[in-house]
Amino acid sequence: PKFETDESKPVFQEIKRRLDLQGKQGSELNGNRISILEATSSSNGLVKTFSRNIEAHVLSPVKKEGEASNAAQADVNDASLVIRWTVKVFGGMNRIMLGGDATVEVWDRIWQNYQNNTDKLSWHILLAPHHCAIDAIARKNKDGKYEYSENALNALGQVISDGFVVSSSKEIKHNDDLLPSWEAKQKYLGMLKDADEARFLNPDTRANAPLLYSPLQDDKPEPVVF
């Protein structure tokens, strides 16, 4: 499949710029760094420690998913990046699951690999995969209707304590849209304690959401420069 799109071109250009700087003066300055992580053949993924307070566990893709994504009829989202971040702040441990656009096939595989080690899938904050699309947690049956995958729901449902789910999408309305999906939202709400709607955050309706950053920043989060 063709991975480069009009939207991705600036990202690839920036990656190339940073790669070209490697080994040269200035490569470690803010805005010039880059880390290269190779897809592993191990079903246990890859753990990368960036500092004593930040760790990334790459759950997907593994090599077979990366190779499959090169097939002519492949779904490129089968090679989407899934990372569970662990961030330690003031002695506390915060776990953040970023599922990219990973499909239900990927989440099925992740559950099969980690069902006996579910701590590796636990989170305080979950970014709903594929902008809260239904195809991250369900697949079509022979009649063309979506059936939910218990494996995928189990993989995504390892919430710690109360937890938050964030949907990076337009407002999720009660209709038959597949991306974002109202039905998928209900599944994520079911993962949260008491199905608390206030803990499901959507940027398109953020006027009703709790502030997750300082109001002293002119109501804008600070950019992260790496």
Stretches with model-predicted labels:
Residues 105-111, 115-206:
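Long, structured stretches of catalytic cores involved in phosphate-ester chemistry, encompassing
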